Regions:
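Flexible, membrane-associating and regulatory peripheral segments of lipid-active enzymes
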Residues: 3-105, 112-131
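Structural cue for short, hydrophobic secondary-structure segments
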Residues: 107-110, 137, 181
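Cap/lid segment of the alpha/beta-hydrolase catalytic domain
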Residues: 139-154
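The feature captures the conserved acid-bearing segment of alpha/beta-hydrolase catalytic domains
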Residues: 216-254
Length: 254
């Protein structure tokens, strides 16, 4: 698991000048159905077409495993996660390009997440586990609000087509193996997309899913059984991790 440390503001993706002095820059590719606002930020409430971007993230050298430290009034690249740069990628850039290597890792965030939080968690995971495979983050339009559970649940369902399209783009770009890592409500979204691909007979994409990891999945046992029955043979390996201390699940249970 990757948690945010301290009582800090919510993460955003506004480039920070302090990041220019950082030594460790981790690139995270992002596919999102969040609509971009006029000033360039991604909206929390509006679902738009799937777009791509590359976010270069400053990862602090002094960071603890599993902890994302956000900046305070004095951002320090040695202690804080900072946005170094954001580069929009034109159109369906993945489908028209080529992916180095055979394997791609896709992370899917859960309930109550800003876009920055999902990207920073992904950068932390890449750094902690020394992931060499190309890693993408799917950012669906969570409201990023503790009391926005119902709205997030609807947004996750609306985001199914965007995630399926992103997986199709990854396949078309040459990936032979796709590993899905989903947290909380993102796990339900992931299961829904696997089910949707099977029902739509998109076996060309489904067959590329080589592994699934669900972290503290926010799915009832009855719903999971129904999804799994519709999917049939689940990708192998298929791993589920649970945690009694997951803050997203504690909020959803209220």
């Amino acid at each position: 698991m990757v948690w945010f440390g301290g009582c800090t503001p919510r993460a955003d993706l506004l480039p920070d000048a302090a990041a220019l002095a950082g030594d460790v820059i981790v690139p995270v590719y992002v596919g999102t159905t969040r609509a971009q606002e006029a000033e360039g930020a991604w909206a929390a409430k509006i679902a738009g077409p799937l777009t791509y971007a590359r976010v270069d993230v400053n990862v602090p050298k002094e960071g603890k495993p599993g902890i994302v430290a956000l900046p305070d009034a004095n951002p320090d690249p040695d202690r804080h996660f900072l946005t170094h740069s954001v580069t929009p990628l034109a159109g369906r850039a993945l489908a028209s390009g080529k992916i180095r290597g055979n394997e791609v890792v896709v992370t899917i965030h859960g309930f109550n997440n800003t876009m920055g939080e999902g990207v920073f968690r992904t950068a932390k995971m890449i750094r902690d586990f020394d992931i060499e495979a190309l890693t993408l983050h799917y950012a669906w339009p969570s409201r990023g609000a503790p009391l926005g559970y119902a709205a997030d649940r609807d947004a996750a369902l609306i985001a199914r087509d965007g995630l399926e399209q992103m997986l199709q783009d990854i396949r078309l770009a040459g990936a032979r193996k796709i590993v899905l890592v989903a947290h909380s409500m993102g796990a339900q979204l992931t299961m829904e997309v696997l089910r949707q691909m099977v029902l739509r007979e998109d076996l060309a994409t489904f067959s590329r899913i080589s592994a699934v990891v669900l972290l503290s999945p926010d799915i009832s046992p009855a719903l999971f059984r129904a999804q799994a029955e519709a999917i049939g043979d689940l990708p192998d390996p298929f791993v589920i991790f649970t945690s009694q201390n997951d803050p997203a699940l504690r909020l959803s249970a209220r």
